[in-house]
């Protein structure tokens, strides 16, 4: 039997809405699963709400709800958000389910049979008023490290230090405010320390986890692995431990078992497997891949494999770990209004924008990802809207108009055929990049393919050719449509709804990576008419992007990261502030001297034209310069050297609409003749915006 792949994302906690930081992981995983399916692989994708534990019990009580009612509300909300974000699980379940209880009890029983469960007396905080032990979140007090007040019993939200509930200063019960007492209780521990050799072998397996994380995990072995407390005293929202009185499984025992329970539920409902054991038995021919954030590596790489191994289950084959999401270079924060719920994003913007931006910045490492809102807008507009979208719109609009939606047969030779064949030759690069989670590399190749096709159209100029020889124009546009079809297939894992629109406009069946194996020119069935073209995605406007952040009253709007001086650059000391009256009268320090008024005739000499950037590259030995190839409607594009390299990556400019000073005398910069200038606005350096004339034809005069 061929190997099957089972993929999971970490379980979202049913204690609140999903935010765009959570979305990084689910989008990353969904892209991978869609890619595997496109390649014809046998893959299933599971997730569930993590529903047990103290925070849920506490917050449900605050809202006057039973925990079951509380988690049901967020379960429905999470499912809706995932669907609208285009994340498609084979099954999304809950850890508060009969299947999860079944497997939690089964696994616990096997751990107990193997002698891996030990009873120990531990000291805990206890509220005599409420007659209950107080887990971390049921106790508050002063942080023993930074002395911040009103902190929970597990970690300080101000300094970030972790501690035991018994370490809190002036501790009190979070429910009633009564100072707790200390009391002994018998708890159950999983003997993780017995499995160090096994876990060392697991960490040494190639591909199991990122090498840097494997090295980091060695620190736990140097200190000696600690046995794991898997029980909590009642009352507690979770599963009662069989054979025990008033003891419950700690959430970190039953939460990962939710992966197995979800497989079981899916098997029951679909009949596609006899049970979860078809995938999870120790001898199953299954590749199990967990996608997680870097904050839960310990549980998934050490505790979880040890538990599975003792219980006779299949251990994870690979653990894919990602970093956290930053917003404009800073940690997201509720108090600053930057902890953006997924729903707030979806109320404003298409999910394709966010999925594309995440993919364009994700690799297989664990570095944090920065959602800089300015960069987000520029990259999406430059690469997705103006490059990929523009190619499809240019080709299909002409085909649908004067050429009556009919494609030309494939050509025996010529630049159009060479364009398509060159694009097909790059498919293995994209496939390999997706397979290795090098999404940003895949996106780079995809945008290069689109740029080449736009350049081909610019040279062929079918909008002019159609008046001279309609069949030549039809052939050129059909070859460009072939590339658009290919781009739809390559982008389908990332932006599925955009690809669906593109396939429909082409009048073609969805194209997959599997179908591309051995594919030859022409890709499209040239005997079929195309559909009705329309813009695939509107441009991202600054107002809509900023609207995803709902600021608390009195909070300042978050800004993109300030430009910093280059390393070794000199900076002037800020002069002492002058009296207010003097400041008002004098020009700002460093301001350019005004040239004064000019005559209209002087201004009329300047010719401003709309242009479109076809290609962009860095100028060697010039950190601030970019060499741009710009179409200004003259038959052949111009080369313009522009000092905007600090503000824009070359790949973010391809496809951008720009305003060009078209009648400047050519001049050489770094040995390159520059024939024009782009209009920008801003203080300079990294803080520049390109003036955009809108969706007008290259060469249109700007008045």
Curated annotation (Swiss-Prot):
Binding-site list for Zn(2+): 143, 146, 156, 159
EC top class, as a word: ligase
Residues annotated as domain tRNA-binding: 602-703
Cell compartment(s), UniProt: Cytoplasm
Sequence ranges of Low complexity compositional bias: 556-568, 577-594
Residues noted as binding ATP in the record, renumbered to the chain: 334
GO terms (BP aspect): methionyl-tRNA aminoacylation
Motif 'KMSKS' region mapped to chain: 331-335
Major location (coarse): cytoplasm
Necessary cofactors: Zn(2+)
Pfam family, one: Anticodon_3
Known role: Is required not only for elongation of protein synthesis but also for the initiation of all mRNA translation through initiator tRNA(fMet) aminoacylation.
Entry's family note: Belongs to the class-I aminoacyl-tRNA synthetase family. MetG type 1 subfamily.
Quaternary assembly: Homodimer.
Protein name as catalogued: Methionine--tRNA ligase
Organism of this sequence: Myxococcus xanthus (strain DK1622)
Gene assigned in the entry: metG
């Amino acid at each position: 039997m061929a190997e099957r792949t089972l993929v999971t994302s970490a379980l979202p906690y049913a204690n609140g809405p999903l935010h765009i930081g959570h979305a990084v992981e689910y989008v990353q995983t969904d892209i991978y699963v869609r890619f595997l399916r496109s390649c014809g692989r046998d893959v299933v994708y599971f997730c569930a709400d993590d529903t047990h534990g103290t925070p849920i019990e506490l917050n449900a009580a605050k809202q006057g709800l039973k925990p079951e009612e509380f988690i049901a509300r967020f379960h429905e909300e999470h499912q809706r958000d995932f669907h609208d974000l285009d994340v498609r699980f084979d099954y999304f379940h809950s850890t508060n389910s009969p299947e999860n209880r079944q497997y939690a009890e089964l696994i616990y029983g096997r751990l107990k049979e193997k002698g891996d469960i030990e009873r120990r007396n531990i000291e805990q905080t206890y509220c005599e008023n409420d007659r209950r032990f107080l887990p971390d979140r049921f106790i508050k007090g002063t942080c023993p490290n930074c002395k911040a007040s009103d902190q929970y019993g597990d970690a300080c939200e101000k300094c970030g230090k972790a501690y035991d509930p018994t370490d809190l200063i002036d501790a009190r019960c979070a429910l009633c405010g009564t100072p707790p007492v200390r009391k002994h209780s018998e708890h159950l521990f999983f003997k993780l320390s017995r499995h160090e050799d096994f876990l060392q072998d697991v960490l040494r397996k190639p591909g199991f986890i990122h090498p840097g994380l494997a090295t980091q995990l060695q620190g736990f072995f140097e200190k000696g692995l600690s046995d794991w407390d898997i029980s909590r005293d009642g009352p507690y929202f979770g599963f009662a431990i069989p054979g025990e009185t008033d003891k419950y499984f700690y959430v970190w025992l039953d939460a990962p078992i939710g992966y197995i329970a979800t497989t079981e539920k899916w098997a029951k409902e679909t009949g596609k497997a006899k049970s979860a054991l078809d995938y999870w038995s120790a001898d199953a021919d299954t590749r199990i891949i967990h996608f997680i954030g870097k904050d839960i590596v310990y549980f998934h790489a050490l505790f979880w494999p040890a538990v599975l191994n003792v219980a006779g289950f299949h251990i994870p084959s690979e653990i894919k770990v990602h970093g956290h999401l930053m917003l404009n270079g800073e940690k997201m924060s509720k108090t600053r209004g930057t902890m953006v719920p997924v729903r707030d994003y979806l109320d404003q913007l298409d999910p394709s924008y966010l999925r594309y931006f995440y993919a364009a910045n994700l690799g297989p490492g664990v570095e944090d990802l920065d959602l800089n809102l300015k960069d987000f807008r520029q990259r999406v507009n430059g690469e997705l809207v103006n490059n990929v979208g523009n190619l499809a719109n240019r080709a299909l609009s002409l085909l649908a108009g004067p050429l009556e939606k009919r494609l030309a047969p494939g050509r025996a030779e010529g630049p159009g055929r060479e364009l398509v064949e060159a694009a097909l030759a790059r498919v293995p690069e994209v496939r390999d990049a997706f397979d290795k989670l090098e999404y940003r590399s895949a996106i780079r190749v995809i945008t290069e393919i689109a740029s080449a096709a736009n350049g081909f159209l610019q040279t062929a100029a079918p909008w002019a050719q159609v008046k001279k020889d309609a069949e030549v124009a039809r052939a050129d546009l059909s070859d460009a449509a072939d590339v658009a079809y290919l781009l739809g297939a390559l982008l389908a894992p990332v932006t599925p709804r955009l690809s669906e629109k593109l396939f429909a406009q082409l009048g073609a069946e969805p194209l997959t990576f599997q179908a591309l194996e051995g594919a030859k020119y022409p890709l499209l069935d040239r005997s079929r008419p195309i559909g009705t073209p329309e813009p695939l995605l509107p441009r991202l406007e600054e107002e809509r992007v900023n609207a995803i952040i709902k600021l608390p009253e009195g909070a300042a709007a978050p800004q993109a990261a300030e430009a910093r001086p280059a390393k070794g650059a000199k900076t002037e000391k800020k002069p002492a502030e002058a009296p207010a009256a003097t400041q008002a009268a004098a020009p700002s320090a460093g301001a350019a001297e005004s040239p004064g008024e000019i005559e209209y005739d002087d201004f009329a000499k300047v010719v401003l034209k709309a242009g479109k950037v076809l290609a962009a590259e860095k100028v060697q030995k010039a950190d601030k310069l970019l060499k741009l190839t710009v179409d200004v409607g003259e038959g052949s594009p111009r080369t313009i050297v522009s000092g905007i390299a600090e503000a824009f990556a070359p790949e973010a400019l391809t496809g951008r609409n720009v305003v060009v000073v078209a009648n400047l005398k050519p001049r050489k910069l770094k040995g390159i003749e520059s024939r024009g200038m782009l209009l920008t606005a801003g203080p300079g350096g990294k803080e520049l915006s390109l003036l955009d004339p809108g969706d007008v034809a290259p060469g249109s005069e700007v008045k």
